[in-house]
Regions:
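A residue-level marker of the well-folded mature domains of exported/periplasmic proteins
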Residues: 2-11, 17-362
Length: 362
C-alpha cells in the first residue's frame, strides 16, 4: 500500500469518526430536531367521576396532539382520584420514555416530588387545569378566582332582596385541589358581608355523595326555612346538593361549574340556577400545543404563555389563563350548544321537552 493511499484511508476514517461524534452529540440533546413520529407524551388526568375528563379533555388533547404531531405516541393514565396512584403513573410514564407529561394533579402538593423526578430525568411537565407544585414548565387553566367571583355574583343576583333574610350554605371543592381554594376565595370576595353563611364545607375528592350528606346535615342543623341559597363549587357537588334539597322540599338558588349535561338540564328544570362553562377545547388545544413544542425541543411561544403564575411551592410558571362564562337558562343556546358541548337533542330529552320549549331551546 502506498503512502498516498494510507493517507487517504486515514483521512476518510477521521472524517467518519468526526461525523459520528456530531451525530452522537446531536442525539444527546433532548428534543433537538425531534420529528413528529418521535414525540412521546404522557397524559395524566385525575379522575372520571366528573364527566368532562373522559368526554372532553382526553379526546380533545389527544386529537390536537395527533394533528400537530401525527406520529406521536400518547400514553394515557387516569388516577381515579388517588394521589398515590398518580405518583405511580408518573413513574410508569418516565420508565416508558415519555418526553413530556401533561399533568392534571389529584393532589397538587403531594405530586411535587414526582414533578421533581421528571425534571431530574429531563422530562418536561405541562400542568393542566390544576397547578401542580414543583418545577413545572408551563400551565394552562382558567382564571379560577374569576370563576368564584362569577359564581358569587350569580348567587347574589338570584337571591335579590332575600339575601339578608336567611342563611346560605357554601360547599367548596376538594382541599387537595388548588383550584378549589381559588374558587372559594373568589366567591368569598363577593359574598362576604352581603350574606350570612350558615354552614361551609370543603368536600373531599369532589365527591357528590359527600356533598349530599353535607347538605342534609346543613338542613338538619339550620332548618330548611332558614336556607335561602347554596354556593356549590361545581356541578358534581350540585347534583348531590340538589338531591338533598329536593328530599327536604327546598328549592333555592344553587350554583355550579363545568357545564355538565345534567347541570344544564337542572337549570332548565329550575333546580339549579347557573353553571360556569370553561370551554374545554381551547384549554385542551393549548396544553397539546405546549406539550408538542416541548417534546420537539422548541420554546413555547409567548402567545401560549402570555402571563406568569406562582405555584404553591413558589415556582414562577409561564401560563395561559382563559376566561370562564356564566351559563343560565337564557343563554344555553349561545354557550354550550354553540360551543359544541351538547346538541339540543342531547339536552332536550322527553323529561325536559317542556322546559326547553319555554326557553326557546327547541
Amino acid at each position: 500500500m502506498t503512502s498516498t493511499l494510507r493517507s487517504a484511508i486515514a483521512l476518510a476514517g477521521a472524517a467518519a469518526l468526526s461525523l459520528g461524534a456530531v451525530a452522537t452529540s446531536g442525539a444527546a440533546q433532548p428534543g433537538a430536531g425531534r420529528q413528529a413520529d418521535e414525540v412521546k407524551i404522557g397524559l395524566l388526568l385525575p379522575e372520571s367521576k366528573t364527566t368532562r375528563y373522559e368526554k372532553f379533555d382526553r379526546p380533545y388533547i389527544e386529537d390536537k396532539i395527533k394533528e400537530l404531531a401525527p406520529g406521536a405516541q400518547i400514553d394515557y393514565y387516569n388516577a381515579a382520584e388517588s394521589a398515590t396512584t398518580q405518583q405511580q403513573q408518573v413513574n410508569t410514564a418516565l420508565a416508558k420514555g415519555d418526553q413530556v407529561l401533561i399533568l392534571d394533579a389529584v393532589d397538587a402538593k403531594s405530586i411535587q416530588s414526582s414533578v421533581q423526578k421528571a425534571r431530574d430525568a429531563g422530562v418536561k411537565v405541562v400542568a393542566y387545569d390544576r397547578l401542580a407544585q414543583g418545577p413545572v414548565d408551563a400551565y394552562v387553566s382558567y382564571d379560577n378566582h374569576k370563576v368564584g367571583e362569577l359564581q358569587g355574583k350569580a348567587l347574589l343576583a338570584a337571591l335579590g332582596d332575600k339575601a339578608d333574610s336567611g342563611e346560605i350554605v357554601m360547599q367548596n371543592g376538594s382541599p387537595t385541589d388548588p383550584n378549589a381554594a381559588e374558587f372559594k376565595a373568589g366567591a368569598h370576595s363577593v359574598l362576604d358581608g352581603k350574606v350570612k353563611i350558615g354552614k361551609e364545607y370543603d368536600t373531599p375528592n369532589w365527591d357528590p355523595n359527600n356533598a349530599n350528606q353535607q347538605m342534609a346535615g346543613a338542613i338538619s342543623a339550620l332548618g330548611k326555612d332558614k336556607i335561602v341559597g347554596v354556593y356549590s363549587a361545581n356541578d358534581g357537588l350540585a347534583a348531590g346538593i340538589a338531591t338533598a334539597l329536593k328530599a327536604a322540599g327546598i328549592n333555592v338558588p344553587l350554583t355550579g361549574q363545568d357545564a355538565q349535561l345534567d347541570a344544564i338540564q337542572r337549570i332548565l328544570a329550575g333546580t339549579q340556577t347557573i353553571t360556569i362553562e370553561k370551554p374545554y377545547k381551547p384549554e385542551a388545544d393549548t396544553a397539546a400545543a405546549m406539550a408538542v413544542d416541548l417534546a420537539q425541543g422548541k420554546d413555547i411561544p409567548k402567545s401560549l404563555t402570555p402571563t406568569t403564575v406562582t405555584s404553591g411551592s413558589g415556582e414562577k410558571v409561564p401560563a395561559k389563563l382563559l376566561t370562564p362564562v356564566v351559563v343560565d337558562k337564557d343563554n344555553i343556546n349561545d354557550t354550550v350548544v354553540k360551543d359544541g358541548l351538547y346538541s339540543v337533542e342531547e339536552i332536550c330529552t322527553p323529561a325536559y321537552a317542556d322546559a326547553c320549549e319555554k326557553t326557546g331551546l327547541q
